[in-house]
Design a protein with these regions (language model features):
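NAD(P)H-binding glycine-rich loop region in Rossmannoid oxidoreductase-like domains
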Residues: 12, 18-53
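Glycine-rich NAD(P)-binding loop of the Rossmann-fold in SDR/ketoreductase-type enzymes
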Residues: 18-21, 48-59, 67, 105-106, ...
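Conserved C-terminal active-site "lid" loop/helix of NAD(P)H-dependent oxidoreductases
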Residues: 173-199
Length: 212
């Protein structure tokens, strides 16, 4: 396992310093690599966010194609957050509706780039869609609601293992809703359950229940 970033690891673990905006850095970091998991994201600056989210996705997939790597896990926010806000059980394959939000548009473009490379070069690629990461809860929150598209770190780690173990990705690219909360039933996990065997590792939503 090789970690790559532009910043030092918060716990002092060894990493490769790689700027995803620089193709040569990305390409040289992939020597001897069997699979790539892309968790890059930047939101706060419009110029840099385009370079990281869009150009970065291009550089990664081009480097993957150039080196012959055949497995990629790409990540990003769902493209159904605005238009489908009043629906329930929203499937991952609902038509994308990224709205006019600049960040969502950059991630929409990155997904299309990844999909195009995956199908042209026959790279088995999974796109994991979620809206926020969270540590495992340690106490009852007493909240009246929960964020319905957040995934717990533990669950994402399991989903990544399941994705790496999936030998064949239909049509070389498939997107998956991923979250840790069955309770709200807003975003469907059916596809992830069926193709990956994904289920939340614990009943995380129980931590949201109010005492009566």
């Amino acid at each position: 396992l090789i970690l790559a970033d532009v910043k030092a690891h918060p716990n002092g673990l060894p990493i490769q310093n790689v700027d995803v905006r620089d193709y040569e850095q990305v390409r040289s970091s992939l020597d001897g690599v069997d699979a790539v998991l892309n968790f890059t994201v930047l939101r706060h600056d419009k110029t840099s966010s385009f370079q990281v989210n869009v150009l970065g996705a291009w550089n990664i997939m081009k480097a993957v194609a150039d080196t012959g790597i055949k497995k990629v896990i790409h990540t990003g926010p769902a493209q159904t957050l605005e238009w489908y806000s009043h629906d329930t059980n929203i499937p991952v394959d609902a038509p994308d509706a990224p709205s006019t939000d600049y960040y969502l548009l950059t991630k929409h473009l990155s997904n299309e780039i990844v999909k195009s490379f995956a199908r042209k070069y026959e790279i088995h690629t999974l796109c994991y869609l979620f809206q926020g990461l969270s540590a495992r809860p340690m106490k009852l929150s007493q909240k009246t609601s929960t964020r319905d598209f957040v995934i717990i770190y533990d669950d994402l780690a399991v989903a990544c293992r399941q994705g790496l173990e999936l030998d064949l990705v239909p049509d070389f690219y498939q997107a998956f809703n991923l979250h840790s909360h069955y309770g709200p039933e807003k975003y469907s996990l059916e596809k992830a359950e069926r193709l990956l065997g994904y289920v939340p590792q614990e009943k995380w939503w129980d931590w949201q229940r109010r005492s009566v």
